[in-house]
């Protein structure tokens, strides 16, 4: 390497005189080809090896060696470089620590390598790849002060050009972050609802239904129960109260129509709805509390012209009331609502049907059992209690006969007499039973049947063996079978007529 090249590579510009600061470091001798740089101090050598390097000469030169670190000249002196070269020392200082470490390691590898001129050109291309073509001739070498952050006026002018790539990188990062924040987070757990790909919020039908149910639960109020507890008003209270108002309005409309001699059909129209609400399970208490029984008594009450309501209404209501769920209506409810009085009126009304009278009688008997403290479970009733009950329902004539027989029998034990039902064999023959069928002088005649006054409380045992297969289909001849048999008979007759009759005279012979 020539002396001119050594001088050109060894000289490094100092900071401008305007800065007024001098570098405390001693200049470093230029590095010759194949020799390590010599410095008076080992610390200074380490600093330059880690933090800065001098870029190779401009591409116009044919042969050049790797650049040696520039040494700071004494204060007040500045030696210009024949070919200014752009470096990245300021970009390295302003960048992050991670990028500084990576770039400094790459630069040390380029400085310390002993490569040929061709390799030097490749390194120049790698170092100058971030610069434009027109910036190659206006580059400056860094000084010692620039390495430690002392900026001159010239450096301030060149800062936008040197940090162009870094600014673009930072702006790109900002744009990516803004795009990420603007995108909807589909996988986020904090989303209130589902979001479609266009960013529009929508709500499923199932979510709407759950929201409505939740709103209904919030509207529920609490009240004091009969037993002192707290009962929650269910959803049926509003429905039943509105139904009761409509039932009363329908009954009033029918009464007005009856007065005006017009057809009354408002209650008939509401009958299916009333039937549906009475068939629901667990709704008896709600019906009682909302005055349903009083509205029902208005439906069963006679019209102003003393005629009974429609037959369909009477049959449906009585059958629904004869359900065990309505047997436990207390006395106060029946008296306050007037339902007991309405059912008793139907039982005693002469125009009421026999079936409805029977249902009304049973219903009144069930409602009267708690009043007389009677048990509804017949399995717990003893034999003596059943006999006493049968005796109480026995006709007066038969009671007299039983009492007359008991008086004739001596009572040795001096026990209190009690009514006892005897069998037919124990009772002596009467005038009507002197002669039996088959006896001499017995006159067969018709007898008026009398209803039995006994209560059959013991269910007979089932003695039928085998499963019931249901009613068998009739095996009678249908129309198809009869037609088929007629056809077969006609064909038989036709076949018999086809038989050739032999003639003695030889007639009708196909010879």
From Swiss-Prot:
Region called Disordered, residue ranges: 1-200, 382-454
Record keyword Nucleus present: yes
Chief location bin: nucleus
Subcellular location: Nucleus
Nucleus listed as a keyword: yes
Residue ranges with Acidic residues bias: 94-103, 166-179
Domain of life: Eukaryota
Limits of the TFIIS N-terminal domain: 294-374
GO biological process, one term: poly(A)+ mRNA export from nucleus
Alphabetical keyword list: Nucleus
GO cellular component, one term: nucleus
Matching Gene3D superfamilies: Conserved domain common to transcription factors TFIIS, elongin A, CRSP70
Record family assignment: Belongs to the IWS1 family.
Descriptive protein name: IWS1-like protein
Organism encoding this protein: Caenorhabditis elegans
